[in-house]
Each structure stands twice: as structure tokens, then as C-alpha cells.
Amino acid sequence: MEAARKGIITPELEIVAKKERMTTEELLPLVASGKVAICANKNHKCIDPEGVGSMLRTKINVNLGVSRDCKDYDVEMQKVMEAVNMGAHAIMDLSSHGNTIPFRRKLTSECPAMIGTVPVYDSVIHYQRDLDTLTAKDFIDVV
């Protein structure tokens, strides 16, 4: 958004414009005004940038993650890659058990789709406490 407000056409904006069958001149003001977000986190090593918002195609999201009942990170990564191969644009990691950090690192290094998480779940895992005992500061510290 910052670059768009300065009139700078980034490589990510060019990619999204092409995917959306728009010109960069059409997309730039949508990003600058906040009507479109380009999801391209610098820590996500292999992301294929996507645009989300007004005037753009609907994106496909897949929810998955490890839990007490399904603890196998390799199985979850297989699901991730199958979802991407089937056209998913976004993966929502709903992991609610164990050490999620290695799984997230694997996601951001191997999965080209946008990735989302649930900070509330991360807080419960990090502090190993019940949700009703966590404070606003606990949530912010985890994020």
C-alpha cells in the first residue's frame, strides 16, 4: 500500500495485475486506497503474490493444521501441497497442538499460497494455559 500511494509499481503489483487481467494502472489506485491488499509477506520465501479485495476474483481458502488427534506435520504438508495443486490460493493454519513453529517455517519455505494463522490458538499453545486465563498482553506478545 505504501508503494502504491507513492505511485510505485512493484513486481508483486505487476504479478497480481496480470493474474487479475487488469492493467497496473487500474490496480494501483485500488491498492493505494486500501480497496485491494496484495498478500506478499517478506518472510514467506516462496509466495506467489495474490490480490484480495474489490474488483478481484474470489480466492479459494483451505483450512488445516495439527491437533491432539492429528499430530503428523508431514501429513499436513501433503494436504497443503495437494490443496495448492488443486487451485487453493490460501492456506489457513488452524494448528492447535504442539510446537507449531517448525510447521510454519516449512509452510513459508515450501508453500506458494497465502498463509493465515489464528493468534488465539497460538497463545493457548505458547502459554499452555486455558483461553480464559490469557490477557490482551499475552495475545499481543505472541503475535
Predicted region positions:
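Alpha/beta enzyme core
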Residues: 2-143
